[in-house]
Amino acid sequence: VKSRTFLLLLSVTTSLFAATKASKTHTVSVGAVRRVPYTQPDATADEKADETSSLKVRALFVDDRQKDWTTGELHEITDRTFAIRRALHINDALPSDTAPHWIWQPGSWITVDRVSGHITALHLPDFDPIVSNAVWFRDYAAYCGTASTSKGANLYVIVAQLGSRRAVVQKLIGRWPQPNHFIPVCQPAKWERLPLRVTIQPTGDEATTYDVVGTSSIVEEGDNDDNN
């Protein structure tokens, strides 16, 4: 009887411990803005000599532990999930260099779950860190992107939706790369709610409006703790 009682108590204790661990709420925050030197990766030698440009970066924390560097403003997708762009600290040293040469570059996008602390890397279609400046609305992101084909690379207008592998909108607007291209390549997208559509203008060219026909929001928000 004592043995059975002990096993029962052990089972209850284990279940309570597992439930407490699974329901643990994490604290997610971003730090203060820090300005760091930044040069466009495809800049000319003269442009690279100009060290006046900078990138605003902020640390991303989960439970007071830094998980990543970010840049730009975060976008609240739901009341518990937000998207934010990564900032990469890259060693740009050549094999012949004797010391590391660290540079900052904007990276891809991630989503962060405030409850579970889970961080997910987003693979937005045709997203190019040099070209793409995503503007969000709900779970949609609109931007100009690039993609390579057997005949070369092209520049596209892209509207992506989270959870969808293919772009909701993909419109060819030119070849890429372009000599002496504008920076930015495209102006920030402008969204309209009803009807759902977005206007994108390549810099120096005419703006075009695209109707967006997607699905209902399919952002997956789980309660599982991934030990972040």
Question: What does each model-identified segment do?
Answer:
Residues 116-126, 131-151:
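Mid-length scaffold segments of soluble, non-membrane domains
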Residues 68-73, 126-135, 178-188:
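Repeated scaffold domains used in trafficking and secretory/extracellular systems
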Residues 10-18:
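Hydrophobic h-region of N-terminal signal peptides that target proteins for export
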Residues 19-101:
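Terminal domain-start segments
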Residues 36-67, 104-124, 155-175, 210-224:
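Surface-exposed loop/turn elements that mediate protein-protein interactions on large endomembrane-trafficking
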